[in-house]
Amino acid sequence: MDNNRVAPEIPGLRQPGQITNDIRMLMCKLLNSAKPANTFPGSQPVSFHLADIEEKLLAQDYYVCEKTDGLRALMLIMVNPVTKEQGCFMIDRENNYYMVNGFRFPCLPRANKKELLETLQDGTLIDGELVMQTNPVTKLKELRYLMFDCLAVNGRSLVQSPTSSRLAHLGKEFFKPYYDLRSYFPDRCSTFPFKISMKHMNFSYDLAKVAKTLDSLPHVSDGLIFTPVQAAYHIGGKDSYLLKWKPEVENTVDFKLIIEPPVVEDKSLPKSDKNRFYYNYDVKPLFHLYVWQGGNDVNNRIQDFEQPFTKSDLELLERTYRKFAEIEIDDKQWNELKAMEEPLNGRIVECSKDQESGAWKLLRFRDDKLNGNHVSVVQKVLESIGDSVSLDDLEQVVDEMRSRWKEREQGLKNAQKQFNHQASARSSLSQQHSTEPEQSQDQPKYVDDDDDNWSDDEPDTKRQKI
């Protein structure tokens, strides 16, 4: 098992049912979403296939960033209307809500930096990944939240805005005041539960540059994420245009692990003695991988190894799961698992498939997930492995990607020029003395028109456009 891939835990208190339901309803209202309140609102990427190069990456503009191998979580920031206190909630993929105390998130100051201590974000929902990474100075592991999207900011839903606009709002209206608070008032931030950064977004044709950084990042990264620039946010479920690319060795599947210790017969005991058959815990057991077929797991107990699933337990389990494969655990790995002194049976495990031997290998436990991958997802992952796209395949179309990006960019500029020319002509007819049309008062001015690309660690003072 790869210890570097151990998923971090959310440093918060899981909220009870009624409070969770109340917050879920408030969030649905915030997003103007018709999705059920019990559905995780985060969008889910799909595995990359060879056809996606022509049909998607070459057909429209995409951002690319590294795929962090951490714990996916949304961050919801709201002010209690009664107490006027700001609350921060982390939402995992099972749609559980955890209150995280200790933060303060201010609004963007309009006059002076003192406003950082006087204002509070209210109604902001961010998408990101919790990850354990190595501090480059202290060399110690620290918890960090890497943000890569924004669904709402200060009560305004952004899900219908394009990705470029959402990132701009995230950078200017959330990350900049947060960063300024840490810069100007570090004593007020010393007890923050974890640090927060924005992920670097690059143009899709810079994918080779991003790929070269994967091994040198302070955290584990297992591929690339491609996000369409002009797309709205897909609330809940799979987004067929949000693509995750992994090297062949990084394509993984989540299963439920079922342990079967060998049964030994003590022939010295009477056949009627219930102790005649017993489990031999001195021998390495069999490790079965079960694939989820849908539905609620009616046997979701996490049991100790000393309490294997009974026949009736397995009958219940097989209403929603079926045996898929066995996993190879060598003696060294088995000793490591025993040394953990943790429950093993019934847990969700992330596994990779060795392409030469075809054997499944254990990577880590996924206690953040209630169920393994659905059988349809497993099938798609296996197809993705068979239809694998290498980094070389992607790099071969980089020039074409850049060329088509520039063509679309020039087309937009030409369309804007034509629009401005027509607007100027109409204005000249109505105002003979006017040589240049004034901007309409009801024409929206978007934040991203003048916004910055905030880096992972500090705002880009050079105001580089995303």
Curated annotation (Swiss-Prot):
<keyword id="KW-0547">Nucleotide-binding</keyword>
<feature type="compositionally biased region" description="Polar residues">
    <location>
        <begin position="413"/>
        <end position="443"/>
    </location>
</feature>
<feature type="region of interest" description="Disordered">
    <location>
        <begin position="408"/>
        <end position="466"/>
    </location>
</feature>
<dbReference type="Pfam" id="PF03919">
    <property type="entry name" value="mRNA_cap_C"/>
</dbReference>
<dbReference type="InterPro" id="IPR013846">
    <property type="entry name" value="mRNA_cap_enzyme_C"/>
</dbReference>
<keyword id="KW-0548">Nucleotidyltransferase</keyword>
<keyword id="KW-0507">mRNA processing</keyword>
<dbReference type="InterPro" id="IPR051029">
    <property type="entry name" value="mRNA_Capping_Enz/RNA_Phosphat"/>
</dbReference>
<dbReference type="GO" id="GO:0005525">
    <property type="term" value="F:GTP binding"/>
</dbReference>
<comment type="similarity">
    <text>Belongs to the eukaryotic GTase family.</text>
</comment>
<dbReference type="InterPro" id="IPR017075">
    <property type="entry name" value="mRNA_cap_enzyme_alpha"/>
</dbReference>
<dbReference type="GO" id="GO:0005524">
    <property type="term" value="F:ATP binding"/>
</dbReference>
<comment type="subunit">
    <text>Heterodimer. The mRNA-capping enzyme is composed of two separate chains alpha and beta, respectively a mRNA guanylyltransferase and an mRNA 5'-triphosphate monophosphatase.</text>
</comment>
<protein>
    <recommendedName>
        <fullName>mRNA-capping enzyme subunit alpha</fullName>
        <ecNumber>2.7.7.50</ecNumber>
    </recommendedName>
</protein>
<comment type="function">
    <text>Second step of mRNA capping. Transfer of the GMP moiety of GTP to the 5'-end of RNA via an enzyme-GMP covalent reaction intermediate.</text>
</comment>
<dbReference type="GO" id="GO:0004484">
    <property type="term" value="F:mRNA guanylyltransferase activity"/>
</dbReference>
<dbReference type="Pfam" id="PF01331">
    <property type="entry name" value="mRNA_cap_enzyme"/>
</dbReference>
<keyword id="KW-0808">Transferase</keyword>
<keyword id="KW-0539">Nucleus</keyword>
<feature type="active site" description="N6-GMP-lysine intermediate">
    <location>
        <position position="67"/>
    </location>
</feature>
<dbReference type="InterPro" id="IPR001339">
    <property type="entry name" value="mRNA_cap_enzyme_adenylation"/>
</dbReference>
<keyword id="KW-0506">mRNA capping</keyword>
<keyword id="KW-0342">GTP-binding</keyword>
<dbReference type="GO" id="GO:0031533">
    <property type="term" value="C:mRNA capping enzyme complex"/>
</dbReference>
<feature type="compositionally biased region" description="Acidic residues">
    <location>
        <begin position="448"/>
        <end position="459"/>
    </location>
</feature>
<dbReference type="InterPro" id="IPR012340">
    <property type="entry name" value="NA-bd_OB-fold"/>
</dbReference>
<dbReference type="GO" id="GO:0006370">
    <property type="term" value="P:7-methylguanosine mRNA capping"/>
</dbReference>
